[in-house]
């Protein structure tokens, strides 16, 4: 009914970058330091993931895939592309969750496949990413939390908090990070990876209309207008 739906399946394809459990296309930059591994296996065997995704896609479910490392993001896109070809399905609005690292060559595939980019600006708070940034390394920082690049490639962007696995569920903090890429104290002054900052309008759209579109509710929520749900904070 309108209040309760069971129409989505979420897969955990990897872990997180801080613990080196998110598969990367290239080895972690701090491999070998304090016993850090060079890379990681997938949290779910790829063949099993692809098989289950195909099955649930065919049965009409919307699929969310937790993928943080750039290799995981690529394999998730590959799996969605395969499911569309095998099942001849389109318009499911499947999602990839988090996408903290991504290869530039994979970004156009989001719009092409109709896969939504579900990301959390609060995770890019410059005050909490020292371990993360060391693991990724300087050369890959420009590929980190690429909100602007996603929009430039016409991807559908949806923002959320990832609560309780984040600093705070407060969307105002998330909006601040998305627009400024600075801590609330103003560090760093120029912003962290500033080329990936987006406008207030773009960030607000991702937090509101993006989520509504993701759940096929863009005609009843996500905007302030007559007839829409008054989900206002």
Predicted regions and their residues:
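His/Asp/Glu-enriched, well-ordered alpha-helical/loop segment
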Residues: 53-64, 71-94, 99, 104-108, ...
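Metal-coordinating catalytic core of metallo-dependent amide/deamination hydrolases
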Residues: 1-74, 78, 109-116, 122, ...
